[in-house]
Amino acid sequence: MANSPHGGVLKDLLARDAPRHDQLAAEAESLPAIVLSERQLCDLELIMNGGFSPLEGFMNQKDFDGVCENCRLADGNLFSMPITLDASQQVINELKLQAGSRVTLRDFRDDRNLAILTIDDIYRADKEKEAKLVFGGDPEHPAIKYLNTKVEEFYIGGKIEAVNKLNHYDYVALRYTPAELRIHFDKLGWSRVVAFQTRNPMHRAHRELTVRAARARAANVLIHPVVGLTKPGDIDHFTRVRAYQALLPRYPNGMAVLGLLGLAMRMGGPREAIWHAIIRKNHGATHFIVGRDHAGPGKNSKGEEFYGPYDAQHAVEKYKDELGIEVVEFQQVTYLPDTDEYKPKDEVPAGVKTLDISGTELRNRLRTGAHIPEWFSYPEVVKILRESSPPRHTQGFTVFLTGYQNSGKDAIARALQVTLNQQGGRAVSLLLGDTVRHELSSELGFSREDRHTNIQRIAFVASELTKAGAAVIAAPIAPYEHSRKAAREAVSQHGSFFLVHVNTPLEYCEKTDKRGIYAKARAGEIKGFTGVDDPYEAPENAHLTVDVSKQSVRSIVHEIILLLETEGFFDRA
């Protein structure tokens, strides 16, 4: 029999509200609507299907304060992660929202009404408290960055009535709700289930440690990877799920089940580990594997870990009795080539030869096409990873040139385009500043906000082309550091981004200006002109800095080509 839900009752709102579906659906059409973001959709789905039991909606201020301050909901139940619905003052005013109002929650992807929220309260988001108490306070933490850059200024708390479940078009058969997974366990006759959380591909070591954990507890294995929002730069979930499916037959027959979890991770370390344990308990698991630095975001810019290596294990252990799910501490296993087996590192005698491949080394081997041995991963898994991680010389990239008007960006960009076309091997796309302004951003002006929007449009196009394997050359002025950083982040999700600062002096740009644009700006005929009455913020971390007043275009292009060659973007075979 599956484990009892957290709080005693599985809050399956979809099942609870199904008899009133037609009535709720009609009402939802008549109410004002909040269109949910991707993260909000992930949260709503797990509220509605009971994955976040005992929650029945988004947290009001009492619940939010209790969770932030002591991991407690207002009713005393343990819960470690704030689950909140943020909204701007503008949305609240436009929809005339207040305590007691009912509002529809709508899916941005297909405009479907998913739920009705009865508002309990609207309160200012205490981002400082949330950042410090929940995530540790480091401004470089991805969850804190999200708080400070994406989350609106108010939270709306209240209970949910479910109207429709979210539509999914990928791996539908593997997206078990908690109730469905519990039924599946009962059908299989499983009473002890070890859940394994991951956001990465699984290899031989993962298979070994999950089998060992199950064997020691006379249990079965639930492979329960996150396929919602994970850490930027992670391997996409489509690739990962294909790899999990390929791995599954390597388990003893009938030992393991694969189920997908549409969770939006916060990378919250200890707090997140408790949250993950609650979620797995709600899905029926009796045991949960917690690893070293579980759900940690890695290191900050100083090379420091955000959390201690065993903080997550200690946090879950602290609440183990209340959680009602047994913690299985992740054992670091290593390969012994002499006996062709994996063993926990603390069981290997001194002097015995061991082999390991780090995550960084694996990525390097995938990038370069180097051999990945069968002792590390199964051939069928490696094949899938190689299909989604082609060698560097076939991958797309973006070269982003920034500098003053008439600094030589366009000349460099055109010459680089010709050189890359001559090189061959990939399509080459050119995004010149004037061209983009004419074709994509003709309605935008030159305010700081409009300039930022223009750069984000360039970044979006560049990221899509890069993802498709093209070489992209972008050459806008891009005067603001925050815009360039946002562009780098957007493109880097799909490929490499190289920032080239064309640091030609303003005086030279103005002196050689044959179009007379600087003269018009000096005369006041053009307002907000970069270098005249609007600042240019020099890049903090350019890959190359060049100067057309001191270098030829040919030599600058050669520098860029050498950079690309050094990074492996040309076939060396």
From Swiss-Prot:
Keywords: Allosteric enzyme, Amino-acid biosynthesis, ATP-binding, Cysteine biosynthesis, Cytoplasm, Methionine biosynthesis, Nucleotide-binding, Nucleotidyltransferase, Transferase. The keyword Amino-acid biosynthesis applies. The record marks 203, 206 as: Transition state stabilizer. GO terms for biological process: cysteine biosynthetic process; hydrogen sulfide biosynthetic process; methionine biosynthetic process; sulfate assimilation via adenylyl sulfate reduction; sulfate assimilation, phosphoadenylyl sulfate reduction by phosphoadenylyl-sulfate reductase (thioredoxin). Residues 170-394 are annotated as: Catalytic. Allosterically inhibited by 3'-phosphoadenosine 5'-phosphosulfate (PAPS). ATP binds at residues 197-200, 291-294, 333. 3'-phosphoadenylyl sulfate binds at residues 434-437, 451, 477-478, 515. GO terms for cellular component: cytoplasm. InterPro entries: APS_kinase, ATP-Sase_PUA-like_dom, P-loop_NTPase, PUA-like_sf, Rossmann-like_a/b/a_fold, Sulf_adenylyltr_euk, Sulf_AdTrans/APS_kinase, Sulfurylase_cat_dom. PANTHER family: SULFATE ADENYLYLTRANSFERASE. Catalyzes the first intracellular reaction of sulfate assimilation, forming adenosine-5'-phosphosulfate (APS) from inorganic sulfate and ATP. Plays an important role in sulfate activation as a component of the biosynthesis pathway of sulfur-containing amino acids. In the N-terminal section; belongs to the sulfate adenylyltransferase family. In the C-terminal section; belongs to the APS kinase family. This is Sulfate adenylyltransferase. It comes from Aspergillus oryzae (strain ATCC 42149 / RIB 40).
